Structure formats: structure tokens, C-alpha cells
Amino acid sequence: MFSEPGKSKFQIDLRRHLRSQNICDNLIHLICEIAEASKYVINAVRTGDLGVAGTSNLYGEEQLALDVLSDRIMRKRLIHSGVVCNIASEEMDEIYQVTTDSNGLYSVAYDPLDGSSLVDVNLAVGTIVSIFSGCDLLQEGRKQVAAMYILYGPRVSLVYTVGDGVHEFTMNQLMEFNLTRENIRMQPDGNIYSPGGLRNKYNEGDEKFIRYLEAKGCKLRYSGGFVPDINQVLMKGKGLFMYPALNGSPNGKLRLLFELNPMAFIIEHAGGAATNGKIPILDIKPEGLDQRAPIYIGCVEDVNRAMEYVYKS
């Protein structure tokens, strides 16, 4: 390809890199349109209203004004891209049908602003995107043709995979995405962990797993934002994020379509693994837009060890 992993000798922009990936023009166009939309989202994050919108999403959660605005930005860009037939957003109650014609088109599921409640305290947030070929969004995550996230932190970075390596781009002063890391790979074992959920609600197996990680010398690194926490695990190449089943919440908190599938697709293609404690996240057949699942995601050996503890419990 263009460079060794983690190195970029020349300024390679997103579109040029996508053209090297042996994918069709429509998919290149779609990913670039999402990247363009993110430029408006980051502007909204930096300057937008931090109050509530007075509405709720399909999970009954109160929507922030930034959630609604970010969703509107992303949805409008997807509709006018000309290559999308169905859209599902964490902020919408049902699938938005752009066209009944699925020939050569894609369906997109996304979380427009994951971690939006962290904006008012100036912590990192992000956009998460899952792309399927055709009009069926309720497929196993393994059938995704692409997945990506955009992290809005001190720098704005975009990470994507189309099934052939995981690559990072960083927004420059001209708001262009240039390649900064190529073919990112996870190590087999890690030394950081990001545990979500209240620990006093953990099941016995998860509590024992946490004690195992602590005894191993793993460092706790948790921001409360799914995108920055996954980004840390991926970029360090060593670690684990977990949001397990909790007492009273057997399916955990995170959404399969909008959060888990795209992140699992990215991590697996970087040499990592993702499971709900029993089977790979990417093998779960979704039954609805609002489906949730526990997750253990990161280095293969840590994920396998988590499964052992969960299975024993």
C-alpha cells in the first residue's frame, strides 16, 4: 500500500486512499459524504446549543439539541448522496426509506453524536457509522461492507475499514482528512481496560474478571465515551473495553446496530475480537432497531479470558 503501519510519507487524502481499496465508486462516494457531514457536526459541537431539545428518542432518553442537530446534518447528507436506500439513526424511531430501489445502493445505521452528554464538560465525543449493501439493515454485523467512526477530540480523526485493514485520517487546518496511520493492528494481549456500568451491579463472573485484570496490572482508562475509549484501545493496540450485562439490565446498555456492530467490525479487522460473552458480536442476528447487547471488545486474549469468566458464572 502507501506506507508502513503508522507512517505516512506523503499527504494522502481520504478519497485517494479509498480508491486504492478495490471498492465501487458508490461506496467511495458514500464514505466521503459522511466525512463531509462530520465537518458540520464538529462545528455544531464547538458552537451549538448545549441544552435539551424537549424530545426523546426510541429508547425514551431525553434528546439534547446537539443530538437532534447532528442527526439532521447526517441524515440530510445521506439522503442527498444518491447512493443510500435506507437510513437508521439512534435518534429516529424507525427506518427512513429514501428509495425502494436497492440496486447498487447502501443502507446506513449511525449514531450521529455518541456521548453527547459529555460535550458540556468538554470531553471527546464521536459519530459511529455502519454500512450494508442493499436495503436490509437487520443483518448480522459480519455482513457490513464498511464501518467507520469520527472522533471529535483535541484533533478530529476518522477511522474506517472496508474489510481490508483499518486506517486513520486526521483533519488538517483546511478541514481535509489526511492519512496518519495505515493498517492499524491490535496486539494479542493488553494492559489497559475501560469498564462501563456500575460495578456494584456486575455479575459474579464480571467482577472476577475485573479482579483478574487488576491483578495483571492493567490500568483503568475510562472516559464515559464509547468512541474515545474504543479509539484509545485501538490506537494503543492493547487493551479492552467492556460494558457487561448488569443486574437489572441483562442486555447491557449499548446498541447493537448503532454502536456495537461498527466498532466490532473495525476491531476485528485490526486483529482484535468482540463478543457478548457467548458469541461474536458480528454473529448476532438483530431482531429490531433498539436491540442491545453486552460487549467485551479489544485484544483477542483479553476477550477470550472475559468469555471464560462469564461462561463460568
UniProtKB/Swiss-Prot annotation:
Domain of life: Bacteria
One GO BP annotation of this record: gluconeogenesis
Cofactor comment: Binds 2 magnesium ions per subunit.
GO CC field: cytosol
Gene3D superfamilies: 3.40.190.80, Fructose-1,6-Bisphosphatase, subunit A, domain 1
Annotated positions binding Mg(2+) 1: 90, 111, 113
Keywords: Carbohydrate metabolism, Cytoplasm, Hydrolase, Magnesium, Metal-binding
Catalytic activity: beta-D-fructose 1,6-bisphosphate + H2O = beta-D-fructose 6-phosphate + phosphate
InterPro entries from the UniProt entry: FBPase_C_dom, FBPase_class-1, FBPase_N, FBPtase, Fructose_bisphosphatase_AS, SBPase
Location of this chain's protein in the cell: Cytoplasm
Residues that bind substrate: 114-117, 222, 253
UniProt-recorded Gene Ontology molecular function terms: fructose 1,6-bisphosphate 1-phosphatase activity; magnesium ion binding
Keyword set includes Aminoacyl-tRNA synthetase: no
Cofactor names: Mg(2+)
Pathway recorded for this protein: Carbohydrate biosynthesis; gluconeogenesis
EC number: 3.1.3.11
The keyword Cytoplasm is annotated on this UniProt entry: yes
Binding positions (Mg(2+) 2): 111, 114, 259
Family: Belongs to the FBPase class 1 family.
Subunit composition and interactions: Homotetramer.
Protein name: Fructose-1,6-bisphosphatase class 1
